[in-house]
Amino acid sequence: MSAELIEKIARIPQFFMPNLNHSKDKVAFFWDITGRVELYVMDLQTKEYKQISNGEVPRALRAGFVWTRDNKNIIFAKDKDGNEKHDLYMINLETKETKQLTETPTFQEHVAHTSPDGKKLLFLSTRNGQRNLFSYDFKNQEIQELTNYPRPIFGAFWSPNNDYIVFGYNDSQNLHNGDIWIMDVDGSNQRKLLSLKDGSRDGVTDISKDGKKLAITSDFEGNSKAGIYNLETKEIKWFGDSSSEEYSGKISDDGSFLVCARNSKATVSPVIYNIESGKEKSLEFPPGIVAGTAVTKNDEFLVLTLNSSINPSRLIKYDLNSHNIDELIPIELGNLDPDFFVTDEYVEYPSTDGLTIGAILYKPKKIKLGEKLPVLVEIHGGPTGQYYRNFSMFDQILVNNGFIIFKPNFRGSTGYGRKFQDMNIEDIGGGDLEDIISGVDYLKTLNFVDKNRIGIFGTSYGGYMTFWATVKKPEIWKAGAASVGITNWKLLYDESMPHFKHYLHMLFGELDKNESLYIERSPINFVENLEAPLLIIHGTHDPRCPISQARVYRDKLLELGWKEGTEGKKTFEYREFTDIGHGGYTDQTFRVRSFKTILDFFKRRL
């Protein structure tokens, strides 16, 4: 495959975070059609759109945006080179002038919601330590701290009647719990509103137009399910049969239906429930990702994004009466042939303890009889991430270069129920590694797999697992590529922000009580076992997995006699990118550079 073709695929335009205005007749979204992510606004009736920003928004997106209540401005968060120390900005849709609202260069700030009278912004910030809720007064520019908790706040909504704010918090001894809280809009009268079970994760996704009902999601029965909570009667109405993970979304303006998302076997599809009768209305789409729960004015349309393994994302308007689909942003392939792309396959296999693991498999279209091909095992982040049957530029590049791609959703992944997701708690790098190794055993049963050419790669937790697998099961791997990965859990804890420390507590337990586990599951302590050549990629501005994670591993390799080099035994390759943080998939320039670097490595080493 030529460098030119790789670049064309890596630069297929992507759009992100479509968000309706308060009148529900326009949609704003990020789009990289120009080669850089910019902010756009489209009229849903005419489909006319205009570019709003010109370099003011981040290249690598890590935060969303909200509309002001008059629909004249959009408020977004921006960091510097991926360091995730966001400040808040407001851009006017007519003049395109940008105004900085907050300036906290060493802290994180994220928009949450706006007050219904348009006077205030609700936002999350770490400016006082832990991530808490604050309000910003647009007129006098005053900032008020609304909460001051020792654990992080998760999301918040301002009621339509301006009489309460709901938010997510956990005050339980059980770190894996999540409850719904409520307070007055000035921050007073804070209290727990709903806790279905100690240990369940309960959250709000929307408030009805009259302010009397909350759309909620909870996993108190195992699988996540959607419901409506009545603030007046305290009653909950649940929907679905709990056979699949389902997440609540938006409530229609007339309050008659709830739009949800169903996650099953690595696909996501919309489901509509009649709130009164509980009856389900499924919307039929091909396997893939059909995302979005936004309902337009007069409850006529859903605004959704569609993509599959062979089709990049497109933005559509789905008519709830006729079921017709109207494309708002079509697929932009340029002169790429759609037949070039390879369809995926969803497979299942048993792990060492009999647990069923789902995975996504790509194989080249034309495999000759008796041909044996190299395999790349691709590991997702999180560890609570999930691989879906969605379009992946890099997977298409790899499979069209003759690699088999295998993407397991190992224990700890989202999408398979709460019990499955919690199986790696205090067992990071244990059962999940066994699931991956069992996946390799499954691959070896396929007659087109070269058992001696198996590689592994991933980003974030996928980077950790690449480091970990290559030192704990060195005999399996011929090469590995770790991007923004973790090599030393204790060092990561020491360098983490308070809300990241809380997440590590959830995975490992508290450091002073479980320090031995942090040490025992760190690849840095087993480097002497490494046999496979490694590619290490890291962004110098990464706040989640700081650059020190890569540097200490590099130094340990050098200490043990390894050398930086592109060929030969006991050699590794090392790249620091000085213009990114924790990856940068939404940045086309980063995609091109990253794809070419990793592909070149595996073509040489595997």
Question: Which functions belong to the PLM regions below?
Answer:
Residues 1, 252-255, 274-277, 281, ...:
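Extracellular/periplasmic ectodomains of large secreted or surface enzymes and adhesion receptors
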Residues 8, 51-52, 100-101, 145-146, ...:
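Conserved beta-strand positions that form and line the central face of beta-propeller blades
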Residues 174, 200-201, 223-224, 246, ...:
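Flexible loop/turn segments at secondary-structure boundaries
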Residues 11-28, 56-77, 88, 104-124, ...:
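Conserved beta-propeller blade repeats
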